[in-house]
């Protein structure tokens, strides 16, 4: 079961900005059942243009309602400092067409993000998948979807794969104890350009904090 991150939809699992096969097809080819989910109040109507008060700013105190512009996405995803420049060694597809398709995948909310609503919806998804397959699901989350992943009832979860989650459960919290008590295997992945990002981009410090907190979480969870 795959859940996308903020500003995205299930399309991010289905293809790449340069048109290659996405995660879902790769897993299907290996014989796995794949279930792609759009968060409540999201959808597949991606952006062709978006307004923002600051095209460089990548974070906001009002982030639940904030819809960054193209440049903000570019820096927050750590592709480069200013589009179309890319960080040295970046594996993001080169060229204007891939960049344009990446921006078009960004999808605004139709309402505010409510983690309780999203987690309840994902609980139903996990229950439905179990009824269909008779098996617990490996839950793959990305970014904001990671926060939802920690909130889901672990009853029908076989494992969690968190791709750059926007946060991890506080050690000793209800979510932490529920996962630990259910003995859920967890693997967390972070990409590159976290420690060498531009200091004047607020999301640079955000990703460092999130990554460092995830390391602390993993050390405690595996102790």
Residue ranges and their predicted role:
Residues 115-137:
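Conserved acidic catalytic loop of the alpha/beta-hydrolase fold
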Residues 27, 152-153:
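Aromatic pocket-lining residues of Rossmann-like dinucleotide-binding sites
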Residues 3-5, 38, 142, 164, ...:
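The conserved beta1-alpha1 loop
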Residues 159-222:
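The feature captures the conserved acid-bearing segment of alpha/beta-hydrolase catalytic domains
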Residues 140-149:
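Gly/Ala-rich beta-loop-alpha elbow adjacent to hydrolase catalytic centers
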Residues 34, 137, 186, 223:
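Hydrophobic anchor at the start of a short beta-strand
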Residues 67-113:
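Extended, charge-rich helix/loop segments that form flexible
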Residues 2-83:
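Short, surface-exposed "cap/lid" segments of acyl-processing enzymes
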């Amino acid at each position: 079961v795959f859940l996308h991150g903020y500003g995205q939809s299930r399309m991010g699992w289905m293809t790449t900005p340069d048109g290659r096969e996405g995660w879902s097809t790769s897993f299907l080819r290996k014989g796995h059942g794949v279930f792609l989910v759009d968060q409540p109040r999201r959808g597949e109507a991606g952006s062709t243009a978006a307004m923002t008060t600051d095209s460089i700013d990548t974070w906001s105190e009002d982030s639940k309602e904030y819809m960054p512009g193209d440049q903000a996405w570019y820096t927050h995803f750590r592709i480069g400092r200013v589009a179309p420049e890319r960080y040295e060694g970046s594996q993001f597809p080169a060229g204007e067409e891939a960049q344009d398709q990446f921006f078009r995948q960004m999808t605004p909310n139709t309402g505010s993000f409510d983690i309780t609503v999203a987690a309840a919806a994902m609980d139903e998804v996990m229950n439905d998948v179990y009824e269909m397959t008779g098996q617990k699901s490996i839950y793959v989350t990305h970014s904001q979807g990671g926060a939802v992943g920690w909130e889901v009832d672990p009853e029908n979860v076989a494992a969690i794969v968190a791709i750059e989650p926007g946060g991890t459960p506080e050690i000793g919290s209800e979510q932490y104890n529920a996962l630990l008590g259910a003995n859920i295997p967890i693997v967390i992945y972070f990409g590159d350009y976290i420690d060498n990002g531009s200091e004047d981009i607020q999301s640079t410090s955000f990703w460092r904090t999130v990554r460092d907190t995830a390391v602390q979480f993993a050390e405690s969870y595996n102790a």
